[in-house]
Amino acid sequence: MDKTKLELASASRRNFLKLAGTGSFTAAMVVGAGGMLWSDAAVAQTANEERDRAAAAEHTMTLATAYVLGASRSYPIMQLDLKENIQNATNGKVYVKLAPGGQLGAGGALAQAVQGGTIQCAQHSLSNFAPFASTVDLINMPYFCGSNQRFTNLVNSDAWKQEVDPKIEASGFKALFYINIDPRVVAVRKGGKGAVITPSDLSGVKFRVPGSAMLQQYYRMVGANPTPVAWGETPSAIKQGVADALDPSVGALFVFGFKDILSHVTFTQAVPDSQVYSMNLEWFNGLPADVQEGIEFAGEMTSHQNLAKVPSARAYAMSELRKAGVEFHSLTDDQLAVWKDAGGYQRSEWDSFKVELAGSMDTFAKLEEAAGTQGRYYVHDA
């Protein structure tokens, strides 16, 4: 590293510690995400702006996520955009204090923190709503809303707002907006069987699955050997061959450091990697009407930004994985049809789940129609 780079790195570290040490952690994160920590002037300006915004605000929203700032480059979680949009759309009446990178936990822990009112807003998997609104788990039904467009159609539909949102709100949550990441993929470890193009290629493959009964059933139906492994233990399981394959989105594979231990990735589009920003309903309902409207508009703005970011985030993650030697495989309509025939939601094996989760086949049919009906939002598909 030459002298200039060393000086910049030293200045960046010094300014980060200075900001964090004076209690301006959000300012430190904002400047860091902008790549400006080396600039004393930029650091001072951002710290002052954050301090002024916090002091002028009438309400503070702690917004927690599992992802570091900058993750949106490959995993479009859009937390800095959401912070900025909420602050501006409420005319500064709300100050958003970010808690990124799992500082306050992740997944179910963040959902519980929002529900209990410990924090006001958090990003978590849509599946974390399932204990409170079982209908949500329909997203894990293969090919029901696996493509980006079907997922976006579904969660923005009147049917979803009528069937799902009231159950979520009855449990103390308000969904601010649903985040489109990309479908889950089939990713094979280095030293594994090779590319997976048809379900028969999964024969004998130990496929890492989460706790979801539906995902376990799906991978069994398409020929794999479902192997439950906790998320935190998954990298070592893949390295050691305890599991041969796994199914996050491409962006998640990159963000969580899998690039050097994978060989092939196939876009099967079965199930979405779906996230949501949820708020504590009681806190939200206690805000003045104009502030509520501002927050909701900020959610809509950030949703547009998220949908626009999906293809570029995927392209970056794919580029980085390719550098590590990973090969990608997109399937033709005929090839996808083989997967759908083998494990898709139209099969009778899924009927019990449809009734259990949707409440009735009529309600399921309503949600199915919503997923297949183009709504007002367009999104690029993998």
Model-found features: residue ranges?
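N-terminal secretory/targeting leader peptides
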Residues: 2-151, 174-382
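A gly/proline- and charged-residue-enriched helix-loop-helix capping module
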Residues: 150-161, 165
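Short beta-strand or tight-loop elements
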Residues: 171
